[in-house]
Amino acid sequence: EGGTNFTNSLLVGTSSTGTLSTATGNIGVGQTVFAALTSGDNNVAVGRDSLKCNTTGTENTAVGNQALCGNSTGNYNTAVGSFALLDVDAGADNNTAVGRSSMITLSTGDGNTAVGAQSLRSATTPGNNTAVGFCALYTNTTGASNVAVGKSALLSNTTGAENVAVGATALLDNTTGGNNVAIGLE
């Protein structure tokens, strides 16, 4: 179902597209992928509801159940894993989320990288964060320019900025502090 103007696009699935009025070069596989798409180009969506709300966003890649589901106009985002970048919305560009529920609540932040299930899970608007490891930067909401490498590194950080935590549970209890460097366990 959906529109009929599928210029250079491949679409497979039930109710898989919006109107695709001027959209080109899109690949969609799964139920309700690209349900709102109008003019976004060169997107890839694989998995139920992936890129479901995308209207004009360009060059996004979503693989997994509801990956990048809320994206409407964001560009150059990559989400791999169920619920990865689920709530990302207008104005969120150049984000990469790999792992189940990574960056699930991000709405408008740019340039974030999350690798690991539930990494950067609570992020809403921060930018330029790097989280690698299960639950790294888990509760970070608006803190920017943080680097967390290791399981639960910077786990409790909410608004602290420009921190570097390397190692499992490094800077575990930091919530708002900034400009810290920790290497090793908590």
Predicted regions located by residue number:
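Glycine- and small/polar-enriched repetitive beta-structure motifs of secreted/surface proteins
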Residues: 1-186
